[in-house]
C-alpha cells in the first residue's frame, strides 16, 4: 500500500479478531515509525507504553468510558508526553507548550504505520480529560512528569471498516484569503 492509499483508507477499528496476535517486533516497527515524527525543536517528548494485559484491557472502560471495545484488542498503546522534555516558552509556563501537538503527530504516525501493516487501531483520547489522565497515571504508576495523551487500541480487524463518503470538501480550502474558495487557475507554461 502506498502512502496516499493508506492515508485515505485508514479508519478507526473497534472490532478485532481475537484469534490473531501482533508480534512484539511489529509493535516495535510501528512505534519506530511514530518516533520519526517531527517535534518542536526536535525535543521528542513522547513515550509509548504498550499494554496487553487482558484484565487491564477489559477494565479500561472504567477509566475511559469510550473504550469498551478495548477488551478485544490485542493491545493498547498509551502515547505519553514527558513534560521535562517538551519545548515550551519556560518551565513555569506549561500553557505554552508543544507537548500535545508533538504527541498528536506521533499518534497519527502510529495509526498510519499500523494500518500499513494490516492492523486496525482506534484513537481514544486521554488529554485533555484530566480525570482520565489522573486515573491512568495512578493505575500505571506514571512518574509526575509523564502525561498520558492518547489511548490507541490495536489489533487485527475482524471486519473491513466502512469507508465514509464525502470527506473531501473543496469549499474548505481557501486560496490566498478566507473568502476565496476557488482554486487558482493553472495555466500551461509557455
Where are the regions that the model predicts?
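Acidic, surface-exposed loops and disordered segments
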Residues: 1-190
Amino acid at each position: 500500500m502506498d502512502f496516499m492509499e493508506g492515508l485515505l483508507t485508514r479508519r478507526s477499528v473497534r472490532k478485532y479478531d481475537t484469534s490473531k496476535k501482533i508480534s512484539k517486533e511489529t509493535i516495535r516497527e510501528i512505534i519506530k515509525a511514530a518516533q520519526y515524527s517531527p517535534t518542536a525543536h526536535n525535543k521528542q517528548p513522547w513515550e509509548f507504553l504498550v499494554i496487553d494485559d487482558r484484565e487491564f484491557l477489559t477494565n479500561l472502560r472504567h477509566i475511559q468510558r469510550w473504550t469498551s471495545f478495548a477488551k478485544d484488542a490485542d493491545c493498547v498503546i498509551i502515547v505519553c508526553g514527558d513534560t521535562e522534555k517538551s519545548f515550551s516558552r519556560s518551565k513555569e509556563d506549561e500553557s505554552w507548550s508543544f507537548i500535545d501537538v508533538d504527541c498528536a503527530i506521533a499518534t497519527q504516525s502510529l495509526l498510519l504505520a499500523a494500518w500499513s501493516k494490516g492492523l486496525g487501531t482506534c484513537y481514544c483520547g486521554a488529554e485533555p480529560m484530566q480525570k482520565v489522565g489522573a486515573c491512568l497515571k495512578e493505575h500505571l504508576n506514571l512518574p509526575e512528569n509523564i502525561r498520558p495523551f492518547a489511548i490507541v487500541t490495536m489489533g487485527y480487524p475482524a471486519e473491513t471498516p466502512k469507508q465514509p463518503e464525502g470527506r473531501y470538501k473543496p469549499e474548505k480550502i481557501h486560496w490566498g484569503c478566507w473568502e476565496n474558495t476557488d482554486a487558482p487557475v493553472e495555466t500551461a507554461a509557455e
